[in-house]
Amino acid sequence: APGSKSTHLAELTNDSAEIIAVDRSAKRLKILQSNLERLNLKSVNTLKADATSLIELNPKFISYFDKILLDAPCSGIGTLSRNPDSRWSLSKEKIKSLTLLQEKLLESIFPLLKKDGTLVYSTCTICPDENNLLIERFIEKNKTLKLVSQKQILPSLDYPGDGFYSAIISYKS
């Protein structure tokens, strides 16, 4: 459901963190808002915006955040077991378009992070172009950053859930 990571983060912090959930979709934010009310969570504020233009929208966001979760739009290849028809909409061109957007999001969002902060990049895909290869290229291009850790989960008999990827990135000390 839209916003499940935001509500989970609010619950993990006992509803005490300042969480700003950003999405371009008013419909998704409305669902999130409904879930926040149902769960009585007050620490999550929603912002309808294109995440690639947050600095232009609010310059105070520069070096503002301690932690950022970038749950990037992706091909969703890791969810094919739940969404088998989505395979018919996949193409090399679509993956290329998504990687360009993912890279733009990383470039746009990293300046919002405090110098001692941490960014978590996550996708629900198992496509290396959208995951480790993208992150390696991004860090190679941005010499002030370092990869703290990364994990690729592949669906299997031992793990029947979705495939996904996450990377933790921070500034070098």
Language-model features: where?
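S-adenosylmethionine
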Residues: 1-173
